[in-house]
Amino acid sequence: MRSASPKDSQSATASNDSKLDLEITEARNDSHPGMASMLRPGTNTGGVITSEEYMTEDEKKVQDLKDFGYHKFRWSSLWQPAEINPLNGKSYTFPIFRMTDAYSTAFWLATIGFFVAFLSWFAFSPLMPEAVKADLKLTNPQVTHANMASLGGTAIVRLIAGPACDRFGPRKVMAALLILGAIPSGLAALVTSAGGLYAVRFFISILGATFVTCQAWCSTFYDKSVVGTANAFSGGWGNMGGGVTIAAMIGLFERYRAAGYSPHLSWRLCFPTMPVPCLLLVAGMILLFGKDHPAGKWSQRHQFSGTAVAIAQGEKIELDASERAEYERRAADREKGPAKAANFRAADPADAGKRVATVDTAQSEPITFKRLLVILADPRVWMCIMCYLLTFGLETAMDAALPGLLFTLFQSNTFSAIDAAYAASLYGLLNLYARPLGGVVSDLLFSKYGLRGRVIWLLVTAFSQGIAMIGLGVYCNRDPQFSGVMWFIFLIGTTGFLANGANYGIPAIICPSAIGTVSGLVGAGGNVGGLLYLGIFLAKPGVKKAKTLGTKFWIAGVVNSGAVLPFFALLIPGKFSVL
């Protein structure tokens, strides 16, 4: 037998290189990347597995920028097909106007689900001052207790919804929350006492946990370079449901009154005719048109090549029962699965310094007690929790307090309780631009300064909200004018909602394999913050004649700013820095 000549060996090597080039090109150009098994085991796909001989110097520079979180924005990316990270299937771009794209569909369903949930969750607030309070003969403390019940329930459910998202996927969890929340929303019409009101509002607050599913769903579909923008737009526009419900529920109540129904019956008819149908309709849309993950089913989420890269880098991948069953089924068809580390070669020593970041390879995994302890030991997680506690917590408290404040300060023949509620609704509508802007700026800073940029932006905006609250409190204790109060409300809303948007881009980076769990912790913090602020408002209600109505606001502002300050220490280089 003739031995292989050096020329034959070189020819075979060149042929193999050509095949590898073709496989990599096809994978990168695939608008809907498939599973890792598309590539031959050991094929270079990126990061530690990538061989630099396939990239020019310019391509390497661009790739380095992308690895750091930069992806050049183009207006056309809003309607063109999503550009996909082949490692994890997430989109580098934000194609919200390409409705047939799975990434756009996930964004809009998450947003609409969040919107109708908040519309229903806050549906009692606009009817409370005039209709519900009078009909049930409630005292002011009872109204406050009802508001606190609606916040406490959400905090509990958010802690449960987070791990559920990591285990079952955010799509299924969101649909379940909407369906469950529709039940007490319909039963609201049967309330006849303060105790019944507390119970109904507690169970309606299940809907507040959709914040967790919204964030987890968007984080599942969008890459680190754009996740802040995607989450902020979804969170901001979805949260507007809390502002829209004021106009919607009051308008519906007035329609029933004009049709001849009594106030006793009018407010009760509002719940089964608006929130309930909206919740059930959107839940059906999510189940019919939604997608669990870019890979398809939630049990298929580890089938992107990033899992293979993570295994090659020595990371341990936890598979749940449904995933193991999926891999066993696929293994029967072909012996190519990312769960088998032996199929993937180890990294070359020369590439050891270019390990792929965990944020690019991680997929959500069921939470364990050990991993939970690791998460709770991370000061960056507590920073996110505290900032959301202070910002979203204030939002929920202000949604309940502002109508009463404006009515008490400016009540007249031309300014009724309904007028005060409409004016207060402008606070929630600031979410239209402020939260999205907070996320966009966060992504821009991340592209230039990394996680440090995101954190600075979050801390500055959260601290500024506290300063604005102090200003409102001092102003209301003097001789306030309507325009002046509204300007302070604008400042408080803008700074607070910017901080919310800034917060949304951080959990997916610091804990990429437990996005749901961290989002649940952060979201629960927001509800605890609402209880904190409502407690301050209840302890210091204030009196108009004594010019003490603003005291509770400046106290809340001092608490806000003081609680943010310690986290600036995370930015100091040295032993205690975590950035």
Residue locations for each model-derived region?
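Cytosolic juxtamembrane N-terminal segment immediately preceding the first transmembrane helix
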Residues: 2, 8, 12, 16-119, ...
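Structural signature of the two symmetry-related core transmembrane helices
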Residues: 172-186, 452-471
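Cytoplasmic helix-loop-helix junction between adjacent transmembrane helices
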Residues: 200-239
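Glycine-rich segments within core transmembrane alpha-helices of 12-TM secondary carriers
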Residues: 228-254, 278, 431, 522-533
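Symmetry-related core transmembrane helices of the 12-TM Major Facilitator Superfamily/SLC fold
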Residues: 265-287, 550-570
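Conserved MFS/SLC helix-loop-helix module at the cytosolic interface between two early adjacent transmembrane helices
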Residues: 156-195
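Extracytoplasmic
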Residues: 105-140, 245-253, 396-403
